[in-house]
């Protein structure tokens, strides 16, 4: 490929819309262009990267015995209604684009394909002799993200590989899950990525177990918590830990203290000299359910802890989903929904806040669902808001008159510095990560809902055991840039680089340089190398900057030494340069490329 035919349009300055390095570089390097919020065009360079990533994914999935297929993007609402996910994905903050056709039939534009594949399995899989089977596809998915950001990281349209396996038993599902785990590790390794496998929450997909694969990068949206010995790692949403022991509140007489302007834990600690673990903070939320219920929540946490909203959402679904329908979302309870004259600033609220404050809203239930984390409930004495402006209570306790009894629910989030459960002598360490893969053991969730059964060895009908396995192909490509870049531009790993080598002609006006460059270009093509020839009539400095920006792993510079058959070989990742006879450097380059393609 010649640059003159490539449609290479690079930018010198960072686009205003881009926040993280990989997004800036992909836009500047002419890999992608924004069409609308969360919607991007993949330009020729990017498409070459995506094809290479997809090829590696296909090779490993095929080697693992999976069968490629292609499922419809338009999905009937009826399937999602049978699984119980239609309302959750379309109402409120649901992420599914949905529409009605000419016959007023409801359809969804697939964000995922569990329902469709399970319906097909119900039709196609009749006997244990057909099991196990694993079907996968690489396809564009659609999600109506509330806040699209970071380019391809969180878009409304993206390329994904999703696979679905069906098994005769839980044990066989476990074996299939383990096989996919190993296939995923090979995929990410071959793509040149440093990935951490972590325990994860199953979220809206569901199931009994799941694991995420995280590319470690400072711009990652997820917080990974892990032990120093490497034996434990989890997404913060799923992580478990032992909380720090609280600093005891010395015996004191119950009293109210003036705390003007001290509406946060940090402000109270600084002004009063208290320790955060001596305080109980109150968080007011509203949980919205499928059947229309809007349930106010009063959550009490120890002052040094944070709420894990994923844990809270899971608990609400488990405890109340059957009676109230699926949980649609959890939002902060706004002051405008309360009886304003009875409610102080939220920083002064205590666990005994009266239900009477809810009289200001006709939409909300008339009483709080009161929940408290054990770290708060186990405090014999604590400091909390006095439910009036500029005041806190000292030496409050849960057994005193007027203190409502909340339900005891594990709601705290694991935090960096917490003690590890498996070894309290170790502390959890934090790093940022970008999720590029997620595997699930779904169990019987979808097969039972959609009637997907098979005849087992005893001739009896039994539900299929199911797993699902996703890789964000377009997200993986951007994550590679986030992990491999420098101040000059991208640094693509060889296996997924759009081109492996770029030949730069220092002066297109020099016939000897052009002749040698053309000769090397032909040799590399014959050797099966993905090579790009920069044949533009531009200054050498412009060509060098573009070559570094777009991140081609190797650069051959044909300059003044061409008269003697001399060229310069530059490795993008290290910046190391070598000059010598073109025959010697070409032989060295081909040998090195062969090793790099294999991840060596």
From Swiss-Prot:
Subcellular location as annotated: Cytoplasm
Gene Ontology terms: cellular component: cytosol
Cross-referenced SUPFAM superfamilies: Class II aaRS ABD-related, Class II aaRS and biotin synthetases, YbaK/ProRS associated domain
InterPro entries to which the protein is assigned, alphabetical: aa-tRNA-synt_IIb, aa-tRNA-synth_II, aa-tRNA-synth_II/BPL/LPL, Anticodon-bd, Anticodon-bd_dom_sf, Pro-tRNA-ligase_IIa, Pro-tRNA-synth_IIa_bac-type, Pro-tRNA-Synthase_IIa_type1
GO molecular function: aminoacyl-tRNA deacylase activity; ATP binding; proline-tRNA ligase activity
Source domain of life: Bacteria
Family matches, as PROSITE patterns: AA_TRNA_LIGASE_II
Reactions catalysed, as given in the entry: tRNA(Pro) + L-proline + ATP = L-prolyl-tRNA(Pro) + AMP + diphosphate
Xref: Pfam families: HGTP_anticodon, tRNA-synt_2b
Assigned keywords, A-Z: Aminoacyl-tRNA synthetase, ATP-binding, Cytoplasm, Ligase, Nucleotide-binding, Protein biosynthesis
Single Gene Ontology BP annotation: prolyl-tRNA aminoacylation
EC class: ligase
Keyword Cytoplasm: yes
Subunit architecture: Homodimer.
Alphabetical list of PANTHER family matching this protein: MITOCHONDRIAL RIBOSOME PROTEIN L39/PROLYL-TRNA LIGASE FAMILY MEMBER (PTHR42753), PROLINE--TRNA LIGASE (PTHR42753:SF2)
Family of the protein in this entry: Belongs to the class-II aminoacyl-tRNA synthetase family. ProS type 1 subfamily.
Free-text note on domains in this protein's UniProt record: Consists of three domains: the N-terminal catalytic domain, the editing domain and the C-terminal anticodon-binding domain.
Purpose of the protein: Catalyzes the attachment of proline to tRNA(Pro) in a two-step reaction: proline is first activated by ATP to form Pro-AMP and then transferred to the acceptor end of tRNA(Pro). As ProRS can inadvertently accommodate and process non-cognate amino acids such as alanine and cysteine, to avoid such errors it has two additional distinct editing activities against alanine. One activity is designated as 'pretransfer' editing and involves the tRNA(Pro)-independent hydrolysis of activated Ala-AMP.
Protein name as catalogued: Proline--tRNA ligase
Annotated source species: Synechococcus sp. (strain RCC307)
Gene: proS
